[in-house]
Amino acid sequence: MTNAKKETSLLTEREWQVVRLIQQDKKYREIATELGLGYETVKTYATRIRRKLNLTSKVAVALWAQKKRKSNG
């Protein structure tokens, strides 16, 4: 499995939903409202996403998602 596929398959569908909204520059409270989740739950998802992808910030997650989108066409 390539590194890109390995990274992509690490995330659950819900984590991907959070990533897409982070990429749209949404705040955690906005993401929580949009997905019908609690604020702390969204923060937990964001932390898990950063750990799984070995990233250190919300901005890094957005940049990673943008790169993935471009590479997938």
Residue ranges and their predicted role:
Residues 5, 51-73:
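Basic, Lys/Arg-enriched C-terminal extension of HTH/homeodomain DNA-binding domains
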Residues 2-40:
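Helix-turn-helix DNA-binding segment
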Residues 1, 44, 70-71:
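Generic low-polarity alpha-helical segments
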Residues 16-20, 50, 62:
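Hydrophobic residues on short alpha-helical segments
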Residues 27-60:
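Recognition helix of helix-turn-helix DNA-binding domains
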